[in-house]
């Protein structure tokens, strides 16, 4: 009896899956219109839809949301620029903070790996605090552009003395790409995105503290010598995040219009990607609308 059940069920299952695969996907019949071509800043632009599609994705044409850059991951001729704020206080020890870059650090957080890597000291490219919060200024890292990633590190040195070892705070860290034409595109948009890891080479009681707003370290008087590193994740200096669209429709129900407000004047190429699809097939149409914001 069990054999007969299997013989009946298996053909039925085979039929089900073959039928599912044969379901034909049609191209979306989808169009977009606007009431006018020119709008004011902060005025809602209403896009009216006709036809239908399973999914619709919206690219508003602003920086970071351009359809033509949806697969872009690098930029030729870009200038990588590093910035951060520092605050060094308490204690009179000098030369306690260094800014370094490595092309060959293997990412292993131990003394041997850190020391085996070649670290280039670029501290002299930055303005460091002498007691109050100061900006590093814009640090050009163009000379480190190459195939493969780099790591950026802060190295802290404190000596066992009768005066406190200096306390350092690093905030507002960012690494951006200045693209041809002047657009600024993020590589590491903020300190929390740096993928920081720390390692104490000497003076294990003290180490870099990693928080979302800052990196900080310090020690009291008469404490053992300290050498502590905090290092970013691997960074590609010419890399950029692909531009992203906004999903405004899925299978949950129909959408007949969509409104968007622009904060800056300019001419925008707005793109809607309409898709019909399932796990076996996918068809799409792309609709463009030009709008001017004044």
Q: Which sequence ranges carry the predicted segments?
A:
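Extracellular carbohydrate recognition and processing domains
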Residues: 114-144
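Acidic/polar, low-complexity intrinsically disordered N-terminal segments immediately downstream
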Residues: 20-95, 105-108, 265-267, 281, ...
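Short, solvent-exposed loop/turn segments at the edges of extracellular beta-sandwich modules
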Residues: 159-161, 275-281
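C-terminal motif of bacterial Sec signal peptides marking the signal peptidase cleavage site
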Residues: 15-18
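Exposed low-complexity, polar/acidic, P/S/T/G-rich flexible segments that act as propeptides
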Residues: 161-202
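Residue-level recognition of secondary-structure-to-loop junctions
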Residues: 256-264
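Short beta-strand segments within Ig-like beta-sandwich modules, predominantly Fibronectin type-III
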Residues: 247-254
């Amino acid at each position: 009896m069990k054999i007969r059940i299997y013989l009946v069920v298996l053909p039925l299952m085979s039929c089900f899956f073959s039928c599912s695969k044969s379901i034909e996907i049609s191209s979306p019949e989808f169009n977009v219109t606007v009431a006018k071509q020119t709008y004011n800043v902060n005025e809602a632009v209403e896009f009216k839809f006709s036809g239908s599609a399973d999914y619709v994705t919206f690219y508003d044409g602003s920086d970071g949301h351009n359809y033509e850059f949806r697969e872009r991951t690098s930029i030729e001729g870009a200038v990588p620029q590093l910035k951060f704020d520092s605050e060094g206080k308490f204690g009179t020890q000098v030369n306690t903070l260094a800014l370094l870059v490595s092309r060959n650090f293997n990412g292993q957080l131990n003394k041997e790996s850190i020391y085996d890597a070649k670290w280039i000291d670029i501290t002299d490219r930055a303005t460091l605090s002498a007691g109050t919060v100061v900006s590093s200024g814009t640090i050009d890292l163009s000379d480190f552009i190459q195939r493969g990633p780099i790591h950026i590190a802060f190295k802290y040195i404190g000596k066992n003395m009768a005066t406190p070892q200096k306390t350092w705070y690093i905030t507002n860290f960012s690494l951006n790409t200045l693209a041809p034409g002047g657009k600024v595109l993020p590589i590491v948009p903020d300190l929390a995105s740096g993928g920081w890891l720390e390692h104490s080479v000497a003076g294990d009681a003290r180490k870099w503290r990693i928080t979302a707003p800052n990196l900080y370290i310090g020690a009291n008087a008469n404490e053992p010598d300290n050498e502590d590193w905090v290092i970013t994740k691997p960074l590609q200096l010419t890399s950029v995040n692909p531009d992203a669209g906004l999903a405004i429709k899925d299978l949950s129900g129909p959408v007949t219009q969509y409104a968007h407000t622009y904060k800056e004047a300019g001419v925008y190429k707005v793109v809607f990607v309409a898709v019909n699809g399932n796990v076996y097939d996918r068809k799409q149409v792309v609709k463009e609308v030009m709008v001017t914001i004044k």
